[in-house]
């Protein structure tokens, strides 16, 4: 439990007094929502932390309920109490009378512990927008509502045959990217950010270019494009499935450290993903939410296709990449693509249109839409057990 002392909430007989006192303390904040965290080891670092600033900016108070102890240390600071609740009884004790909404950030197996509570409104926020298969899971049917960044996410569900009614969706934009700069930075030399995605746990989510073309990409940019500086930021979970990812990371980091002169291993500087996106003039990434978030800047995007699909097949499979420059596994056309993105950028207008489709355009901005939709659910009729 990270309430004040990293102790586990307990209502067992020998600790009942302490547990009741803790619940009373939590109730004084009058929380109206909770964030339910059940993830694979240490995923809170990149799944939960990206939502904490938006959650902290909400006018309403909430709780962060963590099911696994290994998620606690990676959590960033938050104004909301963080409660370690390892058992079903602990979770049940935290559905305080004023709590009306439960937010979920991933499709964890242990979500069912809370989903069965009929009094709450269960809302999937997810942890990013992309054309990955996991972004259109049939598990979405378990939730009362899904709050998405933009219309592209709703289209994605329908294409996958998951045609829920419009009342099951709310478009709130992406609060995480509301503060990113828009348009060219005007800085020289310009920065190319290479941010490959996670390799995925199964075939349908194998999108990472890191161990396919990443090393050669960085080598060629360093050797042939002195007008650029390369920043490297691999997905934090890289190497969990494929050890070859770790070898690629080590080789790229070695090249960048040797090159110096503004070329950067992001981990050496401790930059956040938001800082990386703000500092980049060009993004090279894979099918992932990183590209969706970077659309907020309206700057050029190069998407890697490690599978080597034809351009038509790639866009058919990943529609939100229609406004990205496509780079195949053999890096064919790399110099031409870089000339385009650093020059007249012929995909700029298509990218600006895609930005609205992917990230939405809610009145008042994403944070206001986030807060307004929470108010809507909190002020709706209380549901009782059915």
Predicted segments, located by residue:
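Catalytic binding pocket for nucleotide-activated donors in carbohydrate/polymer assembly enzymes
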Residues: 289-358
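Non-catalytic membrane-proximal stalk/linker segments that position and tether the catalytic domains
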Residues: 1-32, 385-386
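Active-site and donor-binding regions of nucleotide-sugar-utilizing enzymes
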Residues: 36-177
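A nucleotide-sugar donor-handling region in carbohydrate enzymes
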Residues: 3-18, 142-212
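Conserved catalytic-core segment of nucleotide-activated headgroup transferases in glycan assembly
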Residues: 42-57, 177-254, 359-368, 386
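Short acidic-hydrophobic, aromatic-tinged amphipathic segments that line or gate anion-handling sites
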Residues: 81-87, 172-173, 264-268, 322-340
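C-terminal amphipathic helix plus adjacent low-complexity
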Residues: 336-386
């Amino acid at each position: 439990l990270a309430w004040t002392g990293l102790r586990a909430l307990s209502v067992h007989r020998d600790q009942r007094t302490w547990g009741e006192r803790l619940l009373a303390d939590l109730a004084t904040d009058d929380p109206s929502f909770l964030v339910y965290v059940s993830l694979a080891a240490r995923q809170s670092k990149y799944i939960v932390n990206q939502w904490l600033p938006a959650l902290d900016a909400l006018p309403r108070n909430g709780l962060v309920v963590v099911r696994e102890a290994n998620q606690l240390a990676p959590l960033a600071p938050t104004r909301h109490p963080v409660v370690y609740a390892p058992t079903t009884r602990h979770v049940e004790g935290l559905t305080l009378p004023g709590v009306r909404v439960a937010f979920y950030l991933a499709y964890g197996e242990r979500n069912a512990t809370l989903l069965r509570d009929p009094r709450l409104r269960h809302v999937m926020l997810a942890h990013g927008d992309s054309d990955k298969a996991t972004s259109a899971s049939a598990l979405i049917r378990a939730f009362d509502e899904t709050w998405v960044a933009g219309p592209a996410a709703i289209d994605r569900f329908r294409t996958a045959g998951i045609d829920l009614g419009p009342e099951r969706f709310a478009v709130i934009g992406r609060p995480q990217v509301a503060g990113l700069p828009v348009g060219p930075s005007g800085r020289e030399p310009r920065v190319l950010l290479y941010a490959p995605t996670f390799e995925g746990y199964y075939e349908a989510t194998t999108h990472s270019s890191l161990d396919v073309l990443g090393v050669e990409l960085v080598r060629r940019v360093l050797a042939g494009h002195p007008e650029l500086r390369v920043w490297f930021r691999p997905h934090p979970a890289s190497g969990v499935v494929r050890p070859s990812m770790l070898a690629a990371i080590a080789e790229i980091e070695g090249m960048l450290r040797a090159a110096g002169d503004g070329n950067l291993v992001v981990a050496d500087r401790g930059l956040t993903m938001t800082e990386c996106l703000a500092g980049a003039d060009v993004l090279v990434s894979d099918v992932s939410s990183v590209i969706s978030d970077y659309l907020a800047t309206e700057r050029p995007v190069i998407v890697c296709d490690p599978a080597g699909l034809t351009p038509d097949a790639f866009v058919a499979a990943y529609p939100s990449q229609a406004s990205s420059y496509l780079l195949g596994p053999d890096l064919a056309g790399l110099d031409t693509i870089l000339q385009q993105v650093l020059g007249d950028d012929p995909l700029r207008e298509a990218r600006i249109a895609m930005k609205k489709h992917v990230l939405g355009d809610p009145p008042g901005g994403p944070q206001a839409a986030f807060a307004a939709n929470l108010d809507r659910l909190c002020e709706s009729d209380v549901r009782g057990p059915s």
